[in-house]
Amino acid sequence: MKLCAVIIASLLVCAAVASSSDNQKEFAQEKEMTREETQSLGEHEKDDEVTGSEERSCIEEWKTCENDCECCGMSTLCAASWVDGHQIKLCRNEGGKLKKVLHFIQKSVSKIKSCKK
């Protein structure tokens, strides 16, 4: 009976996470602003002058970066590590929400199994 309750609860959590990510994407698309609508139009014009007409692309995983915005993917972060006294920042995939949910489910099942013994 407890196992059924855990399975149902985990399925509900997965459904909630999936629906919230869809809602966030829809919200972001609705609130997307054009350059003319932003107040920092001057900054965008300076960026255009520096980069020229070439398109900006994201940095792939395990390559150097400066901040999270440069890395490809939703769950990829610019993480710092120290090597020989120097700080190196690399884009790393942190797994996202799904990985955390699955890890939580795995821990819950193992705790239930250990309680039965």
Swiss-Prot record:
Main location: secreted
Entry keyword set: Disulfide bond, Ion channel impairing toxin, Knottin, Secreted, Signal, Toxin
Residue positions assigned to the propeptide: 21-56
Name of the protein this chain belongs to: Hainantoxin-XV.2
Organism (species): Cyriopagopus hainanus
Stated role: Putative ion channel inhibitor.
Signal peptide, first to last residue: 1-20
Disulfide cross-links: C58-C72, C65-C78, C69-C115, C71-C91
Protein family according to the UniProt entry: Belongs to the neurotoxin 03 (Tx2) family. 02 subfamily. HNTX-XV sub-subfamily.
Localization in the cell: Secreted
Basic and acidic residues biased stretches: 23-55
UniProt KW Signal keyword: yes
Ranges where the record places region Disordered: 18-55
GO terms for MF: ion channel regulator activity; toxin activity
Domain notes for this protein: The presence of a 'disulfide through disulfide knot' structurally defines this protein as a knottin.
Tissue spec. comment: Expressed by the venom gland.
A cellular component term, taken from the record's GO annotations: extracellular region
